[in-house]
């Protein structure tokens, strides 16, 4: 009897295991949402530089101003394919939240951080990390001095490229203004009569 009972229990156990292995629950969502493509605006830009770093901002609004860590992630230099503008973009790891987002301008200057050969400090008048433009004093630190130098080299290349672009743009504007001035002067001269023309006409009529 004991052997028969054990055999029966083994059969029940194997049956339960078989049922569990065959059981494949599928949960259908209550509401099916269509997949949406999320654009980051990076689709229209060319990646010129990418490197891992840590970003800081100077919290001057605090009672005791100090450097605050903004996040660690990949810092990128991105050039717009049509407009030619170049911006610095950095997102935090995992969350991908933006911690730096501003255009490179000719006036920007990377300055070495005191006591470190792998960190730079610079000012930006309009950083859009918090969506609203805000003036910030930022600092970025790399793994080593070599990486920091690579960033500076590319940053300077971008800054000079934007500077040249703006010079060409201002030159075109100056040329356009000169052409307009000449056309205006020409139209005025055509509309004016010589001073001796009027008396001559009067004499002929007499």
UniProtKB/Swiss-Prot annotation:
It comes from the Eukaryota. Gene3D superfamilies: Pleckstrin-homology domain (PH domain)/Phosphotyrosine-binding domain (PTB) (2.30.29.30). The keyword Phosphoprotein applies. SUPFAM superfamilies: PH domain-like. Residues 1-26, 162-184 have a biased composition (Basic and acidic residues). One of its GO terms (molecular function) is GTPase activator activity. The modification N-acetylalanine is found at residue 2. GO terms for cellular component: centrosome; cytoplasm; nuclear pore. Keywords: Acetylation, GTPase activation, Phosphoprotein. The modification Phosphoserine is found at residues 21, 60, 187. The modification Phosphothreonine is found at residue 13. Residues 1-33, 162-206 are annotated as: Disordered. InterPro entries: PH-like_dom_sf (IPR011993), Ran_bind_dom (IPR000156), RanBP1-like (IPR045255), RanBP1_RanBD (IPR045256). Plays a role in RAN-dependent nucleocytoplasmic transport. Alleviates the TNPO1-dependent inhibition of RAN GTPase activity and mediates the dissociation of RAN from proteins involved in transport into the nucleus. Induces a conformation change in the complex formed by XPO1 and RAN that triggers the release of the nuclear export signal of cargo proteins. Promotes the disassembly of the complex formed by RAN and importin beta. Promotes dissociation of RAN from a complex with KPNA2 and CSE1L. Required for normal mitotic spindle assembly and normal progress through mitosis via its effect on RAN. Belongs to the RANBP1 family. This is Ran-specific GTPase-activating protein. The gene is RANBP1.
């Amino acid at each position: 009897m004991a052997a028969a009972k054990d055999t029966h229990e083994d059969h029940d156990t194997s049956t339960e295991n078989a049922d569990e292995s065959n059981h494949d629950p599928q949960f259908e969502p209550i509401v099916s949402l269509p997949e949406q493509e999320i654009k980051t605006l990076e689709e229209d830009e060319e990646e010129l530089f990418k490197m891992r770093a840590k970003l800081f901002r100077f919290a001057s609004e605090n009672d005791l101003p100090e450097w605050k860590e903004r996040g660690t992630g990949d810092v990128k230099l991105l050039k717009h394919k049509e407009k030619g503008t170049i911006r610095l973009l950095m997102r935090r790891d995992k969350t991908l939240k933006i911690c730096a987002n501003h255009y490179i301008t000719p006036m920007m200057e990377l300055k070495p951080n005191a006591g470190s050969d792998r960190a730079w400090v610079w000012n930006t008048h309009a950083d859009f990390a918090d969506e609203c433009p805000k003036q910030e004093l930022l600092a970025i630190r790399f793994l080593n001095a070599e990486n920091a130098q690579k960033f500076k080299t590319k940053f300077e290349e971008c800054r000079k490229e934007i500077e040249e672009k703006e010079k060409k743009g201002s030159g075109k504007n100056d040329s356009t203004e000169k052409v307009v001035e000449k056309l205006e002067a020409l139209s005025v001269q055509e509309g004016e009569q010589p001073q001796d023309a009027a008396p001559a006409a009067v004499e002929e009529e007499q």
